[in-house]
Regions:
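Core catalytic alpha/beta fold that binds nucleotide/phospho-ligands
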Residues: 1-265
Length: 265
């Protein structure tokens, strides 16, 4: 049984007359059946073993205790995937309701589209393991500690890409995958600027991967050094929404710093 999902801090943005996006945090309550509360019921309620007069059961004061549930790394990954898949679709429905659009998702093939309107849809979420994220401390976690951010973009014009990231890109990963022209510029920045721009580059690359269906290695190796001046300006100015056009692809790029989200549309 899937846990109950809840969306928090939903933020809607209209990027232009043909493009809308939404971001949110999705949390899940732990399903009762995973607690294994009733595994030992036969022995616990054997009146002979407990030496209890069953007639006196109604006079017994009962104390209930549910311990925290710890999940293995594999279980966490599985729960995250399930939670993210349901979470982005829940956010899509919320955005459709906001736009007063009565439609459903066709996710048979990429790019995803809405069935009736044929609008393009793209999802993103945090929490999935990927080579870009900094290593986090390992160990078991309670299911209720799992907290993921989700994002969705709808475009009635053409395929769009979106990427939401909370972790920086490790410098060794950037040097391995990024284009040599990008690395040359990144090396001239302060460490703080470098980490921020490297992360934005990753998000742009991920977004274009979703649009053009590049392989991961192919998409990460693309040269977007011509965009880096705009990216550097965006982190200096810190606007709530930063939009500029990529002259080479003729796509627009939007950066929402508060939501840690990049959209290519």
């Amino acid at each position: 049984m899937m846990p109950t999902l809840n969306l928090h801090n939903i933020q809607y943005s209209q990027l232009d007359s043909k493009t809308w996006c939404a971001t949110a945090e999705v949390t899940a309550s732990c399903p009762l059946e995973s607690l294994h509360l009733f595994d030992n019921l036969p022995s616990l309620f054997n009146a002979n073993l407990l030496n209890i007069d069953t007639d006196k059961f109604s006079h017994i004061t009962w104390h209930y205790h549910i311990s925290n549930v710890s999940l293995s790394a594999r279980k966490i990954a599985y729960q995250q995937r399930q939670q993210q898949r349901a979470g982005v679709r829940l956010l899509l429905q919320s955005l459709l309701n906001k736009l007063d659009i009565n439609d459903s998702l066709d996710d048979v093939s990429f790019p995803y589209r809405l069935v009736n309107s044929q609008y393009y849809v793209c999802f993103s979420h945090t929490g999935a393991s990927s080579p870009n994220t900094s290593t986090q401390p390992s160990g078991e976690k309670s299911f209720n500690e799992l907290d993921n951010k989700v994002a969705v973009v709808i475009s009635c014009h053409r395929p769009a890409g979106i990427d939401i990231e909370t972790n920086n890109v490790e410098w060794r990963v950037a040097k391995r995958f990024y284009h040599i022209n990008e690395i040359a510029i990144l090396q001239t920045l302060t460490i703080t600027q470098r980490d921020t721009v490297a992360k934005l580059l990753w998000q742009i690359k991920e977004s274009f991967i979703k649009i053009y269906q590049y392989t991961l290695a192919q998409g990460l190796g693309m040269d977007y050094s011509h965009l880096m001046t705009c990216l550097i300006n965006s982190i200096k100015e810190k606007p709530p929404l930063f939009v500029f056009e990529d002259d080479k692809t003729k796509y627009y790029l939007a950066y929402l710093p508060e939501q840690q989200t990049v959209i290519v549309y």
